[in-house]
């Protein structure tokens, strides 16, 4: 028989989920193209990438599709509209899933929440945004979750490091911002970071600052150790020579004093010599520690009880530059209920993750088998010709690849 208390909690949970306010939910089912607008950004430069509608090369459900970047060295910009709302007095939950099938070297997997002033056809890298959230990978140095909040027209990066997932499987990223100015970041329904908007972003000036008028007192002693005034230099200390004749040295048998002069033994370092005498150190009884200016209220600080509020959210978008394409987005959610978001994640990612992992492992196994079939001995006869051809194209290929990677890092550094 079910525990009455557990049953009550379960019913309360269902009631809470049923009352969740969903502002936007996109599972990329039929008709998704009517809900999403592809931007004209970068089209004139022929560097705008196209999206594929697919479940990917490996998946847990071939019918669960999303949109995937399909062209290398391209910019991507696409957005969807929802009824304008403010999160004042509400919890804001922003969640989506992303999979880097291409084993991403440098590129983003983040999404943006945009205000009502956004022009979807012009949406691009310079378009102001309210929130930018999601994974970002570039080389060995950058493998983190971005959580960038716009406050007073300035973008503020989170000060804490939140590592992102770097494999080739689907992962769910969730950002929760609450009316009490606290937040949580989850990956695959597991909380990875939590804290306060006040402390983990520099949205406001600090409440306290060092007193600029404070001066260190003249008698403030910062020396932790001092020479021992009772310590005395031993008698004869200064008479100890730095070097002494080598006691093991022997006069050569063929040494002729008349011809070679009087023989003297070479000198060696004196093990008794201790250098210039210094009194030993003792704890300073007057030590007060390192002086610090006292903290005072910052006259420039003004609290904002609505620091968490975004008053006119109306669009969600993806804006990326990718050297290597293959990133797949799915199951985008904007709501006010973290429990509903968790449920959606379990219904989609959670239901399919094991099957997806098995499909990926099978694909990797087949790939290894295909590669092992290639016998290097079969190509020995053509090796010289191939080397000549490779040499001719090597410089051009490498320079093109290097230029593209440098461009990717430049774009990444502008974030």
From Swiss-Prot:
In which broad location class does this protein mainly occur, judging by the first location in its UniProt entry? endoplasmic reticulum
* Residue segments, region Disordered: 208-276, 347-415
Secretion signal span: 1-20
Record keyword GTP-binding present? no
Stretches of Basic and acidic residues bias are at: 208-253, 347-376
The family database entries (SUPFAM superfamilies) matched by this protein are listed as: Concanavalin A-like lectins/glucanases, P-domain of calnexin/calreticulin
Q: Name one GO biological process term.
A: protein folding
Q: Which residues bind an alpha-D-glucoside?
A: 110, 112, 129, 136, 319
Q: Name the protein family.
A: Belongs to the calreticulin family.
This molecule's function is given as:
Molecular calcium-binding chaperone promoting folding, oligomeric assembly and quality control in the ER via the calreticulin/calnexin cycle. This lectin may interact transiently with almost all of the monoglucosylated glycoproteins that are synthesized in the ER.
Report the protein name in the record: Calreticulin
